[in-house]
Structures are given as structure tokens and as C-alpha cells.
Amino acid sequence: MEHHPMIETSTRWPSPAKLNLFLYINGRTENGYHELQTLFQFVDHGDELTIQANHSGDVTISPEIEGVPLQDNLIWKAATALQNYAHCSFGAHIELHKVLPMGGGIGGGSSNAATTLVALNYLWQLNLTDDELAEIGLKLGADVPVFVRGFSAFAEGVGEKLSPANPEEKWYLVVRPNVSIATADIFRHPDLTRNTPKRDLETLLNAPSVNDCEKIVRMLYPEVDKQLSWLLQYAPSRLTGTGSCVFAEFSSKSEAETILAQLSDKVSAFVAQGRNISPLKETLAEYQSASHRPI
């Protein structure tokens, strides 16, 4: 068996959250998909994956997520999709250290899938490009390519047109109201705004940021409305994605932490800084540098 420096080595990889700093719905395509303009930014807070590549050919994950069969786990789906795409016979054991809420609108599952693709592409030495990994990722979820590419991005169309963006790296207080929101229900709602005019990124960055889904989510989910109303007393605040997470923006960590301290202990919340280069990209570069392989 050939020598493979990364096999049986335990490695740690971040799986960061994202925020939609704005989200506009511009119309619908002929096949019913919504056309969007949205700005993705990563934050320096998220899950962590400990990954050990091996020769088994199998992908194992711990801990098991209650109520989610292995075949439905996005980490497993990402790893096996990569195996199939690259005709790869290596395996891996992946341990998920879960911090981000499921279904919160901050990209937890999509980020896990992207971290799996990026890490195993490196550990299995497949040398696939970001374009190839993003193509695999798109079949797993619409937001996966953003996490794979690892740069803040302005997304258009049905979310597939990505261009790099460089918004200010502010501090955020992210709060998760204790409700689960089905994205499909929001996009199907008859009162959803679907005719916001398209604008270029520079115009959008200089205009007040809005999430077109927010009005409907606040109407349907009183917990979200209550939390947003509370945050808006202190700072510009809005919904990310279709929720349920909401966020307030601040110019300093201390300001954000002061407001966090006023929240009830029963409320799930965290403070994080926006990052235009994903912590995942930075970790990959560190591993590549340490092994003297070109980036």
C-alpha cells in the first residue's frame, strides 16, 4: 500500500456559521424557483469536525444524530458523493462537535457538508478544484457552494451565481428563537414580497439592509417577532435566511456582549465577528503549508 501522509492522522476542521446580511426576492423563474439577491458572510463561530482518514472505504460518523438515519446525514452524503465522484477507495471516521442549531438559517448542515468535502479532498489527496467541490456540494444543498469556496459572496439568480464580496466585518449578536421554520412554507406564502427590483452590489451595500422573508416570518412566528423587536431597541437587527435566527450588528465585541448579558439564560445566543474569508479556508491553508504542498 502506497505511503499516504494524511491517513490515520487526526485533523480538526471548523464548520462556521453564515449570515445573510440582506435577502431580496426579485421574481420567479418559469419552473417556480425564486430569484434572489443575497449577501453571505461567515462568522468566527460554528461546529467543528474531527476527521481521521483511513483505508477502510467506509465513512463512519459519531455521534449519531437522533432521528436522522446515517444515509440522511449531510456529512455522510457529502463524503460518499466525493468518494463516488473521485472513484476513491479511502474511508474516514468523522466526529461532529455540534454547536450550531439545526434549521436556524445560519447554514449549519450546509457548512458541515462543505467542511467534509474540503477536508476529505485534502486528506484523501484528490486534488479536486473548488469548482468541482462546489458542483458536488450544490446537489446536497443550495448554500453548500458558498461554504466550499470560503469567501463572502453576493449571490444572484436562484443562488447559483456567486461573486466575491467584501462587506465590513462587524460584530454580531445572533439569537435563536426556539422555533423551527420550514423554508418551503415561507417561500410558498401568498403575501411574500416577490418583486423587489434588482440592484447592483454597490447600491445594495449603501442602502439599508432588508430581508424580504422577515415580514412573513414575524407574522407567522410570534417568538421571532418578539426577539427581533427586543434587539431593534439596541441596534440594526434582522432575520437571516428564513430564520429562525435573528441578528443585531455592532461595531465592537464589547457592545454586542453587553446586550448578550441582558438576554435570559433560556435564550440560545452567541456573539461572533463577521469573516470575509472562512475559517475553513484558513485551516486548509495551514494544513497545506505545514505539509509543504502548494495551495
Swiss-Prot record:
BP-aspect Gene Ontology terms: isopentenyl diphosphate biosynthetic process, methylerythritol 4-phosphate pathway; terpenoid biosynthetic process
Domain of life the protein comes from: Bacteria
Residues involved in ATP binding: P101, M102, G103, G104, G105, I106, G107, G108, G109, S110, S111
Catalytic activity: 4-CDP-2-C-methyl-D-erythritol + ATP = 4-CDP-2-C-methyl-D-erythritol 2-phosphate + ADP + H(+)
EC number: 2.7.1.148
Keyword vocabulary terms for this entry: ATP-binding, Isoprene biosynthesis, Kinase, Nucleotide-binding, Transferase
Example of a GO MF term: ATP binding
Matching Pfam families: GHMP_kinases_C, GHMP_kinases_N
Active site, per annotation: K18, D143
Pathway: Isoprenoid biosynthesis; isopentenyl diphosphate biosynthesis via DXP pathway; isopentenyl diphosphate from 1-deoxy-D-xylulose 5-phosphate: step 3/6
Keyword Kinase listed: yes
Keyword ATP-binding: yes
Family that this chain belongs to: Belongs to the GHMP kinase family. IspE subfamily.
Function description: Catalyzes the phosphorylation of the position 2 hydroxy group of 4-diphosphocytidyl-2C-methyl-D-erythritol.
Name by which UniProt lists this protein: 4-diphosphocytidyl-2-C-methyl-D-erythritol kinase
Species the sequence originates in: Vibrio parahaemolyticus serotype O3:K6 (strain RIMD 2210633)
